[in-house]
Amino acid sequence: MGKLFGTDGVRGKANEELTPELAMKLGEATSNFARKGEKVFIGRDTRRSGGMFKSALESGMASHGLDVIDLGIVPTPAVPFLGKEKEMDLGAVISASHNLAGDNGIKFFDSRGFKIPIAWEEKIENFVFNNVDSKVPGREIGQIYREKKLKRQYVDRLLKKIVPKNFSTGLKLVIDCANGANYKLGPLLFDKVGVDTTCINTEPNGDNINLNCGSTNMESISRQIGRASCRERVCVGV
């Protein structure tokens, strides 16, 4: 039997190694772990291929009776975080992290918000490679819900759970959003905290995620920090 999962989900070149057909089959395979009528939370980043893979994954899940909660473009931690709070049965994120836009990937989380175990990955691979077909009748097809309000709830929960009081005291922050999934929520979070913030790379176009920016190109944020006024405040890059 072949191998689909690596150390961080299923990844590959979009439309070459990772195709819509495979994404749909992966969605169907999740019926191994979530029963008819149970909830699956899905999020993605800003890659051009993300919408295509999201539609395919959702279709596979719904065709097996699962209800999908589509969070839209959100950072990876938002799916397990919100999913656990809202009692999801399974989570999925479409992203290739720090890779460039031509790559993409799909990773899954269990109901506790943890990465699924290797035994689950092997069951999914067995389902895909053996072309198992267990679609439900039309009257039992799952529903797909678009949830926009949960993004704001995620930011609010982070403020309450993670950000300490007086966090902004004497701090000047430069945030490199890398034209990725945090391009809106990152600035929103620190704006609510009250931090003196400069945000860069906040204009994703589907092709520029991590392009000359982000964790693999620290020169970009270093230049911004150098330009920032740090004489009277501590200056930190994120």
Task: Give residue spans per PLM region.
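An N-terminal, well-structured beta->alpha segment
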Residues: M1-S59, S63-G65, L90, Q143-L173, ...
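Short, electropositive, low-hydrophobicity segments enriched in small/polar residues
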Residues: V10-E16, P20, R47, T76, ...
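Gly/Ser/Thr-enriched, mixed-charge loops and adjacent short helices
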Residues: K13, N104-R223
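N-terminal small/polar loop signature for handling phosphorylated ligands or for N-terminal nucleophile
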Residues: N32, K36-D103, L188-S229
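Pocket-edge structural micro-motifs
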Residues: R44, D110, E232
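Positively charged, low-complexity/disordered segments
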Residues: R231-V238
